[in-house]
């Protein structure tokens, strides 16, 4: 049983929604954010990457940066560009990227259910990244970025959500510069809110798809603010901003690997070592892997197909049978010397949204010696890992389309 609740969202006035809504803070660096803000000063990156509105030499983790985030957030309200809903609402967020459509419910999810693993995790978090989000939430008194949650889809929820969409007009409907259509509906009717809440009570567990640092930070903030004696369990900080999608609407793309050198091996030595654990063949149908346990390798201007040999991985191991584990355990670590992909500077990662031509061009330009195109991790694999209480290897999943920040913001201050 999961418990969600509506909240009074802070969101853009409709005429400003397309300009304010922004990609998440963690998919770009400060310079990229600065370039976006130069073109579009209203972008919510003013809040989520407020260092981009300050001097080049500013420490992005200084208190001045978090204070600037609060100043910039307040300015949206004082300038009349964002307003807070006066009654608690749910929000339906529809995204379309090409032929792919996903429809999620924006709601306040329970910190306590996260703590009790009713909301399940599959990634490790880094303390420094958690602390950054803690500082940001405390300074702004807001959760500005949503946690991307999923659940095993239920037809009755889908049917009801679609019926609500059919009966309402969207408050926003715009296409962002990356070609993704974003549509938002507000659910403010008390009976409709009660029905959505009831329907989700029949969902036994939910899973974090993306946003492990945001959810971990929300729990730490709740622990800190919960020390205030006069506060109770209904405080807004005991929940976190989430967009909840059924698993059958989620789209995971490939998360590909680039390695700077061959670890001192010649090309012939490298291919010989690779051939011990993988069948190597010529590619006939383009570079994308066509099935699990297949990989496409780009080396010296040529794509090759790698297929994991039988017996080189434990097929019944939920972690060991993942393609990212097979490549790491049988090639990246033993042959290329990449022992810890989280920290090794010789490896880089690229989301499949950028395409395999870009991957190959990085090798052709000499920045890397070899690239590996992956078959996407499936939602079924992610859920199995989370249900087993295990941790996915780093850089296993790349979700598209990305949620836009500022579609709805969750305020957690004392007056909320």
Segments (PLM) and residue ranges:
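Surface-exposed, charge/polar-rich loops and edge strands
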Residues: 1-416
